[in-house]
């Protein structure tokens, strides 16, 4: 089975579980299973998936059908310009939180050292970004 076929099938499956980001989630989980970037995955949709890779992908996909967030499945989340390790003990950084980082950087002087107190940082994504 090629990458395109398995992506289409998995995306349809996730849609049946009312997962709105079905295609994106499928791409992220498959690229992780293949140990390649999402970009590389999308550039090689005609490539065949190996049985061990397909088994790994099915395992990740099953977790997603149980509504486990992709960041918890993969153990990381891209936020701002970095990749953050994520576990169930921290909140997942949200895309709209990146606006807070942007606004803070616009507000703070660019040429001065910044001191910020962040209590209960969780993943630390806001503070580090």
Which residues does each PLM region occupy?
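A residue-level detector for conformationally permissive "hinge/kink" positions
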Residues: 27, 59, 73, 114-116
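Conserved SAM/SAH cofactor-binding pocket of Class I
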Residues: 98-129
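A general structural signal for well-ordered alpha-helical segments in protein cores
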Residues: 7, 26-27, 57, 67-70, ...
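A short N-terminal interaction module
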Residues: 1-53, 57
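Conserved AdoMet
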Residues: 32-107
């Amino acid at each position: 089975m090629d990458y395109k076929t398995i992506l289409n099938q998995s995306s349809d499956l996730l849609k049946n579980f009312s997962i709105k980001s079905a295609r994106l989630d499928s791409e992220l989980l498959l690229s992780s299973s293949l140990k390649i970037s999402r970009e590389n995955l999308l550039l090689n949709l005609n490539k065949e998936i190996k049985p061990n890779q397909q088994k790994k992908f099915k395992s990740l996909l099953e977790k997603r059908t149980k509504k486990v967030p992709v960041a918890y499945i993969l153990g990381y989340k891209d936020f701002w310009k970095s990749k953050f390790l994520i576990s169930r003990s921290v909140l997942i950084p949200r895309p709209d939180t990146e606006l807070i980082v942007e606004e803070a950087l616009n507000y703070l002087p660019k040429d001065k050292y910044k001191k910020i107190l962040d209590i209960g940082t969780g993943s630390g994504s806001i503070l580090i970004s």
